[in-house]
Design a protein with these regions (language model features):
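Ligand-binding face of N-terminal immunoglobulin V-set domains in extracellular IgSF glycoproteins
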Residues: 48-77, 82-133
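Well-ordered alpha-helical scaffold segments within catalytic/enzyme domains
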Residues: 63, 120, 209-232, 247-254, ...
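Catalytic cores of eukaryotic secretory-pathway lumenal/extracellular enzymes that build
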Residues: 266-267, 283-309, 315-318, 325-369
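An acidic-aromatic substrate-binding cleft motif
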Residues: 125-202, 207
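Bacterial Sec-dependent N-terminal signal peptides
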Residues: 1-47
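Glycine- and aromatic-rich loop/turn segments at beta-sheet edges
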Residues: 162, 180-195, 221-227, 254-282, ...
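Long, well-ordered core segments of solenoidal/helical folds
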Residues: 134-157, 243-259, 319-338
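Aromatic- and glycine-enriched glycan-recognition loops and surfaces
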Residues: 105-110, 193-203, 229-249, 281-291, ...
């Protein structure tokens, strides 16, 4: 509730009386009247921990609190009618994640679709939350939209980005780092910024792209949304595949003609807390890496399958790139560079060191063959 105050009108109390037989009516009336006055002075508490995204109707519904109250009520927010009541039970002392002693409430049997809040017998309450079969739809769309906000090398337009719109960034990606043994410029614009910095890392893309494509491959009917308000929305292609393709196009730029894949494109130092379009300075392409190449081969092989029915030309491009990367791994049976990737002197951006590339090679083989 916005103000933290619950408005339970007197007619609601009278309505509740209908659930009580006449013999107990007076007792129940005064009990509900007391409850009514308690709710007038109830406040929303940060100590009542719910799933604010909501709960699916037929799945477990648990909340936690650090308040040692006796009981809890689940109240429908639009009517202030009590829909469920039960006792709290002890959950854990000194919870390792929070350091708190926690109590839990279980209202899994409440399956009616609606908006509710938890009210504790001590007067604390939760924020409002929904029970609905679509509670995860919004979570999915916002999660997917997060990748759009990470796009590098392009304008984020206000109709799509809202208050997060900004000019194009990092048009100069990138220059070969001296450690590559090469010199000059190689176009590696595009892709997604990584986490909290503006670097772009192939091995990090492996888990992200691989997971997103696996989700679509496993449950295509669950990821066919084409209305996430990204520039490609409405083109008949699931937005998930459109967004992943933006990253795949960058990854293709990171492959050398010999099939090997460069490890990352970053500055030597992490940038400060600035907008991406204000991040100037040279961004370097770092050495060929067998862990990057293995991830790349696996991603491209999986992409070739999923995009085949959408764009056969792009699908074939992905498959050819995956095959070329695999051939590089065969020609280089031990880890490249020797001992695994290490940042060169003067570079402190993400290293993601790995001295064993057997898992990347296995994944690549599984996707290709």
């Amino acid at each position: 509730m916005d103000s933290g105050k619950i408005k339970l009108n007197f007619s609601t109390i009278i309505h509740q009386l209908s659930y009580v037989n006449a013999m107990n009516k007076n007792i129940y009336f005064f009990g509900m009247l007391s409850f009514y006055f308690m709710l007038q002075f109830q406040t929303t508490s940060a100590q009542v921990y719910i799933n604010q995204a909501g709960y699916l109707p037929t799945l477990p519904k648990i909340f936690y609190t650090s308040v040692s109250a006796d009981s809890f009520y689940v109240i429908e927010s639009s009517t202030s009618i009590i829909k469920y009541r039960d006792e709290l039970y002890f959950s854990v002392a000194n919870d390792p994640a929070t350091g708190l002693t926690l109590y839990a409430g279980d209202f899994s049997t409440l399956e009616n679709i609606g908006n509710y809040f938890i009210y504790l017998s001590n007067g604390d309450s939760s924020q409002t939350f929904p029970i609905s079969s679509t509670v995860l739809d919004d979570v999915y769309k916002k999660s997917l939209k997060g990748y759009y906000f990470q796009r590098c090398g392009t304008v984020l337009l206000q109709p799509h980005a809202g208050v997060y719109y900004h000019a194009a960034c990092h048009p100069g990606d990138g220059f070969y780092h001296s450690s590559t043994g090469q010199s000059g410029f190689r176009l590696t614009t595009g892709g997604w910024h990584d986490a909290g910095d503006y670097g772009k890392y192939v091995v990090n893309s492996g888990i992200t792209v691989g997971t997103l494509l696996l989700a679509d491959e496993s449950f295509p009917d669950k990821f066919n949304h084409d209305n996430s308000n990204i520039p490609e929305s409405g083109n008949g292609v699931p937005d998930l595949l459109d967004e992943v393709r933006y990253e795949l196009e960058w990854l293709l730029k990171m492959q050398n003609d010999n099939g090997g894949v460069y490890f990352k494109t970053t500055k030597e130092q992490f940038e400060s807390f600035i907008m991406p379009q204000n991040d100037s300075g040279i961004r370097y392409i770092h050495v060929l890496s067998s862990t990057a190449t293995g991830n790349f081969a696996a991603m491209m092989a999986r992409a070739a399958r999923l995009y085949n029915s959408i764009d056969t030309t792009f699908s074939n491009k992905c498959l050819n790139a995956a095959t070329l990367a695999w051939n590089y791994l065969i020609a280089n049976p031990t880890i490249v560079p020797t001992g695994g990737f290490k940042n060169p002197t003067g570079t402190v951006t993400g290293e993601y060191g790995d001295t064993n590339d057997s898992d990347e090679r296995l994944w690549a083989a599984a996707e290709l063959f």
